[in-house]
Amino acid sequence: MQKIRRDDEIIVIAGKDKGKRGKVLKVLADDRLVVGGINLVKRHTKPNPMSGVQGGIVEKEAPLHASNVAIFNSETNKADRVGFKIEDGKKIRVFKSTQKPVGA
């Protein structure tokens, strides 16, 4: 079970975007995350009239490593760590500071 999943709100704790918050758009297999509005890079794209793609410089989100982010606890307004608990035979994610379920 992953500690950070899609649609979790995270805060960047290291790197050029330190302190910024965003929502996880995609989780990649090698412990990398794509987060909305964070780690933006410029990509030069060729025009492709067949698929209707206009050429130019496009800004898009690049993946960043999971070790550079922490899950954001909206109750405490701080970065938090994730632990696991078994309730009713199911494994659930909980915030370490409050012991409340993540996303509830």
UniProtKB/Swiss-Prot annotation:
SUPFAM superfamilies: Translation proteins SH3-like domain. Part of the 50S ribosomal subunit. CDD domains: KOW_RPL26. The keyword rRNA-binding applies. The lineage of its organism: Bacteria, Pseudomonadati, Pseudomonadota, Gammaproteobacteria, Pseudomonadales. One of its GO terms (cellular component) is ribosome. It comes from the Bacteria. Keywords: Ribonucleoprotein, Ribosomal protein, RNA-binding, rRNA-binding. This is Large ribosomal subunit protein uL24. The gene is rplX. GO terms for biological process: translation. It comes from Ectopseudomonas mendocina (strain ymp). PROSITE patterns: RIBOSOMAL_L24. One of two assembly initiator proteins, it binds directly to the 5'-end of the 23S rRNA, where it nucleates assembly of the 50S subunit. One of its GO terms (molecular function) is rRNA binding. Coiled coil: none annotated. Belongs to the universal ribosomal protein uL24 family.
